[in-house]
């Protein structure tokens, strides 16, 4: 079946189901193009919490769909591919976090939204790459912060505020593929281009950036920047949106190796099957949800 026919069927079923299609910036181009909303984790969370749709089709990875389920317990949350997980989210478990909390009993727990619902249930407040510094600054009543699971985002935040951080040894396998030599090579090839990087990158990579931004921050910055050329250091899926929204500018990936395999599992065919068969449903248990929503709600309250 060709793409236009698939899109037609998806749109018809979406209307019948009263569904909304939420798509992360790293998804393949064809999936981004059918979205009701394309964005980063923070924007997706806010859109999910505000929707009046009966069905949320989440084209991303599992923790994102879980967050939607936490925020919208009365909605049906579907993932087109049940195997679309996040390796970094899997690097920390609720059991490991509880042990860390015992070790640092005076610390507040700041969890990246890239975590399981069970980890969020053990968390004081969540953050995304777009608001991590603001969230950490909002924790006025503590000098100690446990940050899980991304050690590189934690390091970046720790350079911006004066607190005692305890890092977990987690990382994004996609962003660690971005190396200093990749940036230097691209800067040599495109000397007029500005370098914009994601805070999940290594510190030695971050040091070479003109701007350090979340994916949504990158999209906003690209529209405002006077630069006609931008070197982008994050998962390459975002290039589609950047180019679509800024047709008069040129965008170059730091490296073509920055691909998240699980983000690429979702296809138009799977979105169609998802709406036809109403699977795979992601449902966080009420016991976990009522604990986890406190941390997620606190994140959404910080502007």
Where are these regions (language model features)?
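Active-site loop-to-helix "anion-binding N-cap" substructures in soluble metabolic enzymes
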Residues: 1-232, 238-303
């Amino acid at each position: 079946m060709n793409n236009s026919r698939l899109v037609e069927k998806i749109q018809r079923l979406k209307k019948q189901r009263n569904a909304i299609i939420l798509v992360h910036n790293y998804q393949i181009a064809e999936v981004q193009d059918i979205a009701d909303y394309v964005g980063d984790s923070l924007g997706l969370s806010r859109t999910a919490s505000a929707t009046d749709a009966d069905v949320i089709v989440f084209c991303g990875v599992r923790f994102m769909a879980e967050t939607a389920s936490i925020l919208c317990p009365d909605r049906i949350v579907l993932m087109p591919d049940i195997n679309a997980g996040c390796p970094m989210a899997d690097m920390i478990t609720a059991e490991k976090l509880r042990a860390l909390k015992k070790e640092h009993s005076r610390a507040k727990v700041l969890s990246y939204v890239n975590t399981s619902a069970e980890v969020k249930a053990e968390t004081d407040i969540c953050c995304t790459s777009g608001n991590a510094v603001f969230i950490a600054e909002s924790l006025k009543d503590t000098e100690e912060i446990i940050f899980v699971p991304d050690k590189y985002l934690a390091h970046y935040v720790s350079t911006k505020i004066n607190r005692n951080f305890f890092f977990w040894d987690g990382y994004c396998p996609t962003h660690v593929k971005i190396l200093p030599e990749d940036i230097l090579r691209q800067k040599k090839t495109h000397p007029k281009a500005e370098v914009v990087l994601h805070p999940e990158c290594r510190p030695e990579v971050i040091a070479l950036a003109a701007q350090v931004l979340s994916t949504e921050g990158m999209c906003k910055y690209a529209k405002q920047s006077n630069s006609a050329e931008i070197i982008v250091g994050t998962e390459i899926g975002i290039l589609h949106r950047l180019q679509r929204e800024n047709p008069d500018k040129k965008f170059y990936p730091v490296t073509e190796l920055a691909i998240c395999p699980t983000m690429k599992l979702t296809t138009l065919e799977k979105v169609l099957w998802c709406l036809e068969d109403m699977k795979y449903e992601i449902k966080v248990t009420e016991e976990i949800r009522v604990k986890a929503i406190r941390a997620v709600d606190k994140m959404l309250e910080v502007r």
